[in-house]
Design a protein with these regions (language model features):
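A short beta-loop-alpha structural element at the N-terminal edge
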Residues: 1-13
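Conserved active-site tyrosine of GNAT-family acetyltransferases
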Residues: 14, 125-126, 130
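Active-site rim helix/loop that mediates acceptor-substrate recognition in acyltransferases
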Residues: 14-54
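Conserved beta-strand in the GNAT
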Residues: 51, 57-70, 76-78, 83
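Conserved acetyl-CoA pyrophosphate-binding loop and the N-cap/start of the following alpha-helix
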Residues: 88, 92-100
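Conserved short alpha-helix immediately C-terminal to the canonical SAM/SAH-binding motif I
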Residues: 97, 121-124
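Conserved GNAT acetyl-CoA-binding A-motif
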Residues: 105-118
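Conserved catalytic-core motifs of GNAT/GCN5-like acyltransferases
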Residues: 114-116, 131-149
Length: 152
């Protein structure tokens, strides 16, 4: 079951499992813009934190927030921080979390959702309808690329 969770719950998972070696601070929002650049105005939008629960145990997370319009994409929503605990992978929970994040974005009026996934999780994003929008390149947290999907 997917439900909204608190910042503290998702931050714990991100800091301890998804990005344990990250040197920059982990915050509720990302200033990243689609296909490059940063804009602090992204932090003016509402962030939503989602958790996937099995038998009342939190086994996966994802978040999303609106981003400033760019010439590349217009009104857009960032999916960020997808993580499913190792023993629960391969069951479709990551895809369900991405789809639930897309539903939140659509309900808020967004038509495009984008992310910056690690190459190790690309298959999950592809199953959820994302297409690659850039080449893969090293980042602070792994090898990543920009990807997007239309919310219809």
């Amino acid at each position: 079951m997917i439900k909204e969770i608190s910042w503290e719950e998702i931050q714990y998972v991100w800091a301890n499992y998804l990005w344990p070696d990250r040197t920059s601070s982990i915050q509720t929002h990302s200033a990243m813009c689609f296909l490059g650049g940063h804009d602090m105005k992204n932090k003016d939008t509402k962030a939503t934190f989602l958790g996937y629960f099995v038998d009342s145990q939190l086994v996966g997370v994802n978040s999303g927030h609106g981003c400033v319009e760019t010439a590349h994409i217009g009104s857009n929503y960032r999916s960020r921080g997808l993580y499913v605990h190792v023993q629960y992978r391969g069951k479709g929970y990551g895809t369900e979390l991405l789809n639930a994040t897309g539903l939140v974005a659509k309900q808020q009026g967004y038509t495009i959702m984008w992310s910056y996934p690690k190459n190790s999780s690309w298959h999950t994003y592809n199953k959820a309808g994302f297409v690659l929008e850039s080449d893969w390149h090293p980042s602070e947290t792994g090898t990543n690329a920009y990807a997007s999907c239309k919310l219809e």
